[in-house]
Amino acid sequence: GARVGLKFWVNDAFMGQTVARGGPYIARVEAQCPREVESLEILADGEIVATLRDLPAIFSERIDGLPEASWYYAKITMPGGFVEYPSNIAPAEGPWAWSSPVFVEG
């Protein structure tokens, strides 16, 4: 698949870790992608709560003022669609990358 280096924090908690309940909640994303990024979305409890568009292939961004949630994750979308083959072959490469979630205590 597309080789994307993606790091995601909420406050001081790295993806896969747990952050203390009680805001403010601040996301930080660092990414190294093979091409420019159409959008960076921050999701909280499955809902998109922040979107940044037209980012370079290598970036570091901070998003302030996230709403309280039970978990957060980051999703990157690069240009291009998902390649579909007329068979049951499922290619690993696509225009997306996701972080692991950051969980909120309690």
Each PLM stretch: what is its role?
Residues 1-106:
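C-terminal functional module detector
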